[in-house]
Amino acid sequence: MSNVGTSGRIPLWLVGTVAGILVLGLVGLFFYGSYVGLGSSL
């Protein structure tokens, strides 16, 4: 992990990690919400 090419910007690996966590959280929340919604409606 070197800082080459990241002058004044956020490291790409950090952006990828945060984005991955957010995407997983949103997808999990979406599936959980749809599962609970379908379970309660059906």
Swiss-Prot record:
PSII is composed of 1 copy each of membrane proteins PsbA, PsbB, PsbC, PsbD, PsbE, PsbF, PsbH, PsbI, PsbJ, PsbK, PsbL, PsbM, PsbT, PsbX, PsbY, PsbZ, Psb30/Ycf12, at least 3 peripheral proteins of the oxygen-evolving complex and a large number of cofactors. It forms dimeric complexes. One of its GO terms (biological process) is photosynthesis. Belongs to the PsbJ family. This is Photosystem II reaction center protein J. It is a single-pass membrane protein. It is found in: Plastid, Chloroplast thylakoid membrane. The chain crosses the membrane at residues 10-30. Gene3D superfamilies: 6.10.250.2070.
